[in-house]
Amino acid sequence: MRKLNFISGNKVTLLHCGADYFSKILSEIDLATHEIYLETYIFANDKTSALVKAALNRAAARGVKVRVIVDWVGTGDKHSDVLVREFTQAGVECRRFNPWFRRGLARTHRKICVIDSRVALVGGLNIIDDLVSDDGSGLVLEFPRWDFAVHIEGDLVAHIFLEIKTQWLRLGKMNLLTRFKLIRNLRQSARSSAPLAMQAALVVRDNLRNRATIQRAYLHALGLARKRAILATPYFAPGGKFRRALISAANRGVDVTLLIGVGQFSLQDAVTNSFYPKLFAHGIKIVEYQKTQLHAKVAVIDHEWATVGSSNFDGLSLFVNQEANIVIRNQAFADALTTYLEQGIAEGHPVDPKEYANQAWYRRIWYGIAYFVYRGLMRIATLGSYT
C-alpha cells in the first residue's frame, strides 16, 4: 500500500467521542454472526472496556470467531496477560503485539474493528472509558476525551479486513511460506464493486512496505491545498518534511490552523512549543485545546479531503509505530468534521504570536532543550529518518 487506493461504494459515518463510538461498536458486535477482528493500543480495565469485553464474549458463546489484538505496552504487561487468559476461557482468541520489544520498538497504535467483513470501525479511540485519563493516572476527566472514529460500510471494508487479518497472521506461529500464501490469497480476494459517491482509502503505517504512507498522504493533500487546512492532534512534533509542507501551504495563501492538545505531558508540550516561532512567522494559526484531553488525529483540507485515524503528528506515529487512518474524499463528510473542528477551535485558546514572543527567556531555553532531547531520541529510534 505505497500509495492511496481510493475505493468507491462506501458509506462512511463520523463518530464523535465515546458516546457515539461505543454505542456503535457494541451494537455491531451483538449483530455479528461470523467473525470479529479487533485491534487496539489500549484495552483498559474499566466499566466501558468491561462492556466491550462482555459483548465479545457473548459473540464467541454464540459461535462467532472472535480475534483480538492488544498492544503489550498500551494495555500493559500484567493486564494484557490477564486479558489473554480470560478471553481464552471465553472462547476468544487474543494476541499481544510485540511483548518485551521482541520485534523492535514499534507498537500497534491502530484502532480497528471489522465485523463479518460487513462493517468496520477505524479511528483514534481505544477501548477505555473516555471520562478516564488514558495516561494511566486514573484521573477522572470533567468532559469526555475529544476524539473521533468512522463507521464504514461498503467496498472499503474488504481492504480493512485484509489489513487486520494480515496483522493477525503476522503475529501467529505459522511458517513464513504458509503465512505468505495466506496473505497473498487475502489480497487477491479484496476487490471493489459498484461505484458510489463516497470515496475512501485505508492508509496504514508499518515498518515494511508502508513506512511513510500516512505522511505522504498528508504531504500530497497539503501540496494541493488552495484555501483552508485544519489539523488536530494531541501531540505535534512532526519531521521537517511535514513542517515544510504546512509552511509552504501557508505561504501560498492557505489558511492553516493547528488545533493541539496540551496539558497531559509537560515534555511533549515543551517540544511542541519549540516549533511555534517558525510556524507563526509564516502565518500559521495555533489553537491549544484545554477543555479536556484532545485525542483526535483528524484533518480537513479545502472542504473535500478529510482524514480520521490513529496517527499523531509526531515522530513515533509517523516513523515508528503501526497506525491506521481513513482518508475520505467527500464534501458532506468534510463539512461535518469541519463543524466539530470549528467547535473545538472556539473552545480552545488561540496562541497570540506577540504574547508568545514575550515569554520568559528560561521558558524558551527549556523548549529548545526539550526539542534537542526529543530529536536525538527520535533519530535513534528511527535510525535517522526523523529530521
Residue map of PLM features:
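Charged, low-complexity intrinsically disordered terminal segments
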Residues: 1-387
